[in-house]
Curated annotation (Swiss-Prot):
GO terms for biological process: arginine catabolic process to glutamate; arginine catabolic process to succinate. The lineage of its organism: Bacteria, Pseudomonadati, Pseudomonadota, Gammaproteobacteria, Enterobacterales. It comes from the Bacteria. It comes from Escherichia coli (strain SMS-3-5 / SECEC). The gene is astD. Pathway: Amino-acid degradation; L-arginine degradation via AST pathway; L-glutamate and succinate from L-arginine: step 4/5. GO terms for molecular function: aldehyde dehydrogenase [NAD(P)+] activity; succinylglutamate-semialdehyde dehydrogenase activity. HAMAP family: Aldedh_AstD. Its EC number is 1.2.1.71. NAD(+) binds at residues 220-225. Keywords: Arginine metabolism, NAD, Oxidoreductase. Catalyzes the NAD-dependent reduction of succinylglutamate semialdehyde into succinylglutamate. Belongs to the aldehyde dehydrogenase family. AstD subfamily. It catalyses: N-succinyl-L-glutamate 5-semialdehyde + NAD(+) + H2O = N-succinyl-L-glutamate + NADH + 2 H(+). This is N-succinylglutamate 5-semialdehyde dehydrogenase.
Length: 492
């Protein structure tokens, strides 16, 4: 029984699904998808639970959410192993994901009060108040790269605001989704407040097509995000929050410490086997001898990166991709870039057939035209050379996406110029692109999405503002507008 609907574990009536470890092939989870009828059942359960949940005090909702945080802490080792085994990422990285889930609880509570709490200002004849109200029933679509942390960034603020939820994890990480849901169950959420439906495209389409849905919060690929945007077009009454990745540029303008710059680049491009939406996909490198030296060192260090299993000791920097198919897609993209005229500096290699263990790839594309503006979701870095900083910024902005952008340079003036001209929601200076502050908004512009998911600004789209003018008594104004006559004289 792998669906959690209205406080009960039930068996899915849709297609059967088996999840294997992407490296070893070990069977980790088996179950059935939710069919359309069960998706509708989950929505009705969430709708029925909404009035009572929304009418609880914020403190009562906070108690449940903090109980979930405590359960994450006490079950950290177990959840770390589940996420690592299911995604293929190393144990150390899965542990950081669970830690991030725990930390986001306190941040989300603070964000609710700062971003969407209640405010009151006195007026001569009363008061003006601002309150926030939950939307109602929200669908949350989770991604596979951070199957605990990223859905958590939607679910926690949505629950705190008083919404009820239908959560659909990625079909590639059903085990992690179920494990997290069991902790929510232990936290004592009332039946129907949070529901779990497993499944792939058919389940997702049934969920997004629900008429009684008040909103949809999505993290995933641009293609799926665009489909959801089209599907919900003409429905302005529904909130739609999209985080869709990017084709992110990293500008290496001047690196006094080449090894430090190489380390930053590897952290930006290859951490999580390149499966972070903020990963650097395009390396923009200044022409000249220093750029040549940097590139040679980057290739030399990157070729030492050997992917390993989730529990290898010593622990590897990167593990496998989410699936062998995902790894093959990266290899295919590399071959296509070569065919366009790209010059391979480091070839990505699938270490063993039937696994997702893929080594990083680096390919130079300087002078090649017609390169697709697409996100290759894996450890493949494309390199372009530039002659001046204005050209670098033009190249950085030459994308329909706008998630993250970074600069390596000792010159504050160049960073200030980048801040003014960059089209990206995250712009870092001498820091990896994959680094983001939990108390800052996360997200981008253009094809990278609209709202800012993950805790701090998520509070904004999990509740709507209600403005009020208030007075505890009603009296006739001392001064009336022209044309109004409230005298006792009888009009003849």
């Amino acid at each position: 029984m792998t669906l959690w609907i209205n406080g009960d574990w039930i068996t899915g009536q849709g297609a059967s699904r088996v999840k294997r470890n992407p490296v070893s092939g070990e069977v980790l989870w088996q179950g059935n998808d939710a069919d359309a009828a069960q998706v509708g059942l989950a929505c009705r359960a969430a709708r029925a639970a909404f009035p009572r949940w929304a009418r609880l005090s914020f403190g009562d909702r906070q108690v449940r959410v903090e109980r979930f945080a405590a359960l994450l802490e006490s079950n950290k080792a177990e959840l770390t192993a589940i996420i690592a085994r299911e995604t293929g990422k190393p144990r150390w990285e899965a542990a950081t994901e669970v830690t991030a889930m725990i930390n986001k609880i306190a941040i989300s509570i603070k964000a609710y009060h700062v971003r969407t709490g209640e405010q009151r200002s006195e007026m001569p004849d009363g008061a003006a108040s601002l309150r926030h109200r939950p939307h109602g029933v929200l669908a949350v679509f989770g991604p596979y790269n951070f199957p605990g942390h990223l859905p958590n960034g939607h679910i926690v603020p949505a629950l705190l605001a008083g919404n009820t939820i239908i959560f659909k994890p990625s079909e590639l990480t059903p085990w992690s989704g179920e494990a997290v849901m069991r902790l929510w169950q232990q936290a004592g959420l009332p039946p129907g407040v949070l529901n779990l439906v497993q499944g792939g495209r058919e389940t997702g389409q049934a969920l997004s097509a629900l008429e009684d849905l008040d909103g949809l919060l999505f993290t995933g690929s641009a293609n799926t995000g665009y489909q959801l945007h089209r599907q919900l077009s003409g429905q302005p009454e529904k909130i739609l929050a999209l985080e869709m990745g990017g084709n992110n540029p990293l500008i290496i303008d001047e690196a006094a410490d080449i090894d430090a710059a190489v380390h930053l680049t590897i952290q930006s491009a290859f951490v999580t086997a390149g499966q972070r939406c903020t990963c650097a996909r395009r390396l923009l490198l200044k022409s000249g001898a220093q750029g040549d030296a940097f590139l040679a060192r980057l290739v030399a260090v990157s070729q030492r990166l050997t992917p390993g299993t989730w529990d290898d000791e010593p622990q590897p920097f990167i593990g496998g991709l989410i699936s062998e198919q995902a790894a093959q897609q990266v290899v295919t993209a590399w071959h296509e870039l070569e065919a366009m005229g790209g010059r391979t500096l480091l070839a990505p290699r699938l270490l063993q057939a039937g696994t997702s263990l893929l080594t990083p790839g680096i390919i130079e594309m300087t002078g090649v035209t017609g390169v697709p503006d697409e996100e290759v979701f894996g450890p493949l870095l494309r390199v372009w050379r530039y002659d001046n900083f204005d050209e670098a910024i033009r190249m950085a902005n030459n994308t329909r996406f706008g998630l993250s952008c970074g600069l390596v340079s000792p010159e504050r003036e160049k960073f200030d110029q980048l801040l003014l001209e960059a089209r990206a929601g995250i712009v870092n200076w001498n820091k990896p692109l994959t680094g983001a502050a939990s108390t800052a908004p996360f997200g981008g512009i253009g094809a990278s999405g609209n709202h800012r998911p993950s805790a701090w600004y998520a509070a904004d789209y999990c509740a709507w503002p209600m403005a009020s003018l208030e007075s505890d008594s009603l009296t006739l104004p001392a001064t009336l507008n022209p044309g109004l006559d409230f005298s006792d004289e009888v009009v003849r």
